[in-house]
């Protein structure tokens, strides 16, 4: 199976998600992008798209926005796309009803070297605790948060000049660098997962 034969549905919302969205679009058959609905923001109440929706529009990708993740018609829509993997980056927790849809599983990119800083705000915790390094982890999603089998990890140095923005950018790019090898590892070497 070549990479372009691997069907991906991507779930994400933030700027942190975008490098991996591009990597998935460049390397795989990206069937759809699921993101939150556009919202009115600021004083002028302008309608703003999520960063993921903005990029998906620029790339002319199929967008599914603002859905109830447990809605039967949404679930059927995902099944009809015949995904091999879900790739989830900076999105909400997927309900159990979705986890069985992709043929091989759902992969999350988390911005820490799991199990350290499991859960919310891992970048902030690494900075507050003055760590000298952190990293990203790819793992298979299980019903309990950040507990699935780890596929791969990449360590990133934290410099004295790093702040949330700079470290988040480094980690988002590192996650994008891992996604292709992580998917191929799941397909061909699943017995090696941690």
Task: Please provide the spans of the model-predicted regions.
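Internal alpha/beta domain cores that form substrate/cofactor-binding pockets in large enzymes
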Residues: 9, 31-34, 62-81, 86, ...
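Donor/substrate-binding cores of folate-linked one-carbon enzymes
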Residues: 26, 85-194
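N-terminal beta-loop-helix "entrance" segment that forms/cooperates
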Residues: 39-59
């Amino acid at each position: 199976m070549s990479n372009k034969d691997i069907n991906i549905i991507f779930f994400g919302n933030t700027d942190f998600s975008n490098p991996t969205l591009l990597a998935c679009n460049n390397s795989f058959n990206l069937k759809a992008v699921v993101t939150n609905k556009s919202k009115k923001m600021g004083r002028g109440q302008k309608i703003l798209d999520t960063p993921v929706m903005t990029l998906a529009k620029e790339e002319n990708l199929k967008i599914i926005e603002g859905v109830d993740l447990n809605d039967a018609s949404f679930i059927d829509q995902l099944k009809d796309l015949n995904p091999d993997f879900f790739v989830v980056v900076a999105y909400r927790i997927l309900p159990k009803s979705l986890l069985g849809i992709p043929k091989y599983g759902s992969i999350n990119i988390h911005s820490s070297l799991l199990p350290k800083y499991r859960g919310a705000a891992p970048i902030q915790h690494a900075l507050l605790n003055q760590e000298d390094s952190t990293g990203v982890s790819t793992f298979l999603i299980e019903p309990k948060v950040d507990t699935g089998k780890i596929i791969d990890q990449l360590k990133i140095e934290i410099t004295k000049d790093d702040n949330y923005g700079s470290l988040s950018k480094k980690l988002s790019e590192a996650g994008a660098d891992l996604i292709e090898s992580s998917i191929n590892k799941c397909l061909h070497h699943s017995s090696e997962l941690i």
